[in-house]
Amino acid sequence: MSKSDHFLVINGKNCCVFRDENIAKVLPPVLGLEFVFGLLGNGLALWIFCFHLKSWKSSRIFLFNLAVADFLLIICLPFLTDNYVHNWDWRFGGIPCRVMLFMLAMNRQGSIIFLTVVAVDRYFRVVHPHHFLNKISNRTAAIISCFLWGLTIGLTVHLLYTNMMTKNGEAYLCSSFSICYNFRWHDAMFLLEFFLPLAIILFCSGRIIWSLRQRQMDRHAKIKRAINFIMVVAIVFIICFLPSVAVRIRIFWLLYKYNVRNCDIYSSVDLAFFTTLSFTYMNSMLDPVVYYFSSPSFPNFFSTCINRCLRKKTLGEPDNNRSTSVELTGDPSTTRSIPGALMADPSEPGSPPYLASTSR
């Protein structure tokens, strides 16, 4: 196959573009599952945040913004799936193409940023329980969240004013990750948004685990399970994002070495990149697990709902008037998830005394 078979000029840059039929066969089912489970999980999380939380704390504000970012990313997946199903033939026009790519990039980056903020918040609450950052007001947390959203939009807004749709034979290509002989801002952000948060998450997770072991808390079986959860969060982040980043770096190396003189050498890495890129959306699908274990509100809510259903079934009693939202304020009589006890704000009712009383 000659260079011209896959060669395409995009915005004045020489690029290699592929329309691999394997993408149309493999990725739509994967994205479909991510969409369904991600929509259910994040939609339920937002519903609980909006209608069943009676009190707000800074940590919950950060979790809420994480849920918003994940939800906005997930709702873009049907359009991306349609693009893959039609073998890289975008059918919705130039402006929708820009909006979709912007939403995917902005909310992927926003999701990573707020997941990192949650990790930092847990770090200060467990390792430095008396630090002034643990006492920031809801207003300050909201201002920080607005600043982070502004930063995220500023780093990805170029996708809105750049023409992202290119005629490719009989099809219209809509992609922000074509293989072009130039290192773009978008590529730099794709790498930075992984390595910097990864370093922060690993540092925070490691310090939390080390701090608990120094206090000899890790001998407790329940704390061991909580520590395992912290490690799982970091591992899932790596599994979701590292493969696509590694393949992208490989593409940069090939471009540095061979330019785009022969597009055939990029065929396999192009397929590998878009396959692994679909794994990054899995992180947004799995983030509701973080919400569940990071706040007593979620396990309390589900426990209350299950207890009500069981009570109705077994006793046939009418539902009482006690509001579910009261349960979410942290009723001390409610048994919480043990991993949540470690990850939650020590000042919340229901948090274990060995976290709240630590003064080191």
From Swiss-Prot:
Pfam families: 7tm_1 (PF00001)
Region annotation (Disordered) ranges: 320-360
Biased composition (Polar residues): 321-337
Modified residues (Phosphoserine): S325
Disruption phenotype: Niacin administration has no effect on serum adiponectin levels in contrast to wild-type mice where levels are decreased.
BP term (GO), one: negative regulation of lipid catabolic process
Cellular component GO terms, alphabetical: membrane; plasma membrane
Primary localization class, coarse: membrane
Cytoplasmic-side segments: 52-60, 120-140, 211-226, 292-360
Topology of the protein relative to the lipid bilayer: Multi-pass membrane protein
Residue ranges that the UniProt entry lists as topological domain Extracellular: 1-30, 82-98, 162-189, 248-270
Induction context: By interferon-gamma in macrophages.
Keyword Membrane (UniProt): yes
Disulfide cysteine pairs (residue numbers): C97-C174
Keywords assigned: Apoptosis, Cell membrane, Disulfide bond, G-protein coupled receptor, Membrane, Phosphoprotein, Receptor, Transducer, Transmembrane, Transmembrane helix
Transmembrane spans: 31-51, 61-81, 99-119, 141-161, 190-210, 227-247, 271-291
Intracellular or extracellular location(s): Cell membrane
GO molecular function, one term: G protein-coupled receptor activity
Job description of the protein: Acts as a high affinity receptor for both nicotinic acid (also known as niacin) and (D)-beta-hydroxybutyrate and mediates increased adiponectin secretion and decreased lipolysis through G(i)-protein-mediated inhibition of adenylyl cyclase. This pharmacological effect requires nicotinic acid doses that are much higher than those provided by a normal diet. Mediates nicotinic acid-induced apoptosis in mature neutrophils.
Family statement: Belongs to the G-protein coupled receptor 1 family.
Name recorded for this polypeptide: Hydroxycarboxylic acid receptor 2
Organism in which the protein naturally occurs: Mus musculus (Mouse)
